[in-house]
């Protein structure tokens, strides 16, 4: 920010002198509202520019997520760090006590005598129609607040973390966040759409999506600390678009650049290649819009890798997958496979639209 941090500010991220917290000298800070917008914008971008939208819909048994559903999931993403308004988290910047993380206080609210007294400032009561019932909403919120890769079990609630002080009022911080989220995603609150059902796999997948969005939204090479709180969502959406492009998460350009007749000739770099029998068999396996599982077992040297690449090309061209993942048992095998896949990708895609191959 373009001014020093004060105890009345709600910060999300800090930069210390020499990147060393022990110095106690904060040289820059990123506001909670700005980071909330960053992660929400990445979530929105991933749901509108990648296959993840289809994947989440399929876990529910739906054909697609509506734009209202996307807005609602993006709005939930904006609430992911709501626990940072607590006294315990904000105190970490000023050497005060008590201190706490930002996940467990939010989850522990579930064990408060009146959880809604703490969640109401976030507008939670207005979300009841987003899900099949309040239990589903509760689990979806747990997936939202517990976004650091492992489940968080509610524990003892500490009301002291939520009490107001001379410097800050956590309730006011939640209210302000809710106000902005409604401005950023009006369709989430004003639109109508079928309620999210009680589907644990969907909740789990949303948690994974949010974890990815938080990683990307926390990368300062894409999301530098804000200088001002003017138009945080406009800024966030611009950075999110740049990040999705830079990370090759949107495959549309690569898909469009793929030749319509790409096959074993291009994969192997051998014109007029006559496929092995197992390769012909894999080539002819049907593609299913709702997904499928193909199991290939064959002798070493029979061309299984190229067969898998040929199937990937067909799936990718049709928009049924965004990428390809090989799982092999040893580093040596992985290195050899990486070299072969890299060579095939170079032959399949022009340089400026070539998807990355990582190991």
What role is predicted for each listed range?
Residues 72, 293-295, 323-325:
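Residue-level preference for the first positions of well-ordered beta-strands
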Residues 260-297:
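Conserved pre-motif I regulatory segment
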Residues 289-312:
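Walker A/P-loop
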Residues 1-259:
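Accessory nucleic-acid engagement/destabilization modules that flank
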Residues 348-359:
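Inter-Walker segment of RecA-like/P-loop motor cores
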Residues 304-322, 340:
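Walker A/P-loop NTP-binding motif
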Residues 322-346:
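Conserved Walker A/P-loop ATP-binding site and its immediately adjacent core
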Residues 253, 257-262, 309, 342, ...:
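Catalytic cores of nucleotide-enabled group-transfer and carboxylate-activating enzymes in metabolic
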């Amino acid at each position: 920010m373009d001014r020093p941090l004060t105890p009345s500010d709600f910060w999300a991220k800090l930069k210390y002198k020499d990147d060393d917290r022990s110095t106690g000298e904060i040289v820059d800070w990123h506001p909670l509202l700005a980071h909330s917008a960053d992660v929400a914008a990445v979530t929105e971008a991933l749901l509108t520019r990648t296959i993840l939208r289809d994947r989440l819909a399929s876990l529910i048994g739906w054909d697609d997520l509506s734009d209202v559903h996307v807005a609602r999931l993006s709005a939930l993403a904006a609430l992911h760090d709501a626990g940072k308004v607590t006294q315990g988290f904000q105190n970490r910047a000023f050497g005060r006590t008590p201190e706490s993380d930002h996940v467990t206080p939010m989850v522990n609210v579930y064990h408060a005598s009146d959880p809604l007294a703490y969640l109401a400032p976030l507008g939670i009561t207005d979300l009841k129609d987003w899900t099949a019932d309040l239990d589903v909403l509760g689990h979806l919120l747990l997936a939202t607040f517990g976004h650091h890769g492992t489940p968080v079990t509610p524990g003892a609630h500490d009301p002291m973390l939520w009490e107001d002080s001379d410097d800050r009022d956590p309730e006011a911080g939640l209210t302000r966040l809710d106000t902005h989220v409604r401005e950023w995603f009006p369709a989430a609150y004003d639109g109508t759409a079928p309620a999210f059902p009680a589907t644990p796999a969907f909740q789990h997948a949303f948690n994974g999506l949010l974890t990815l969005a938080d990683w990307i939204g926390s990368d300062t090479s894409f999301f530098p600390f804000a200088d001002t709180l003017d138009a945080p969502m406009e800024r966030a959406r611009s950075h999110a678009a740049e990040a999705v492009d830079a990370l090759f998460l949107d495959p549309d350009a690569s898909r469009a650049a793929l030749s319509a007749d790409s096959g074993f000739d291009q994969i192997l770099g051998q014109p007029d290649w006559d496929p092995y029998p197992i390769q012909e068999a894999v080539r002819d396996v049907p593609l299913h819009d709702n997904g499928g599982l193909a199991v290939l077992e064959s002798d070493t040297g029979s061309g299984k890798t190229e067969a898998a690449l040929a199937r990937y090309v067909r799936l990718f061209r049709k928009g049924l997958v965004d990428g390809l993942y090989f799982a092999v048992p040893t580093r040596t095998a992985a290195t050899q496979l990486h070299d072969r896949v890299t060579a095939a990708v170079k032959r399949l895609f022009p340089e400026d639209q070539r998807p990355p191959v990582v190991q």
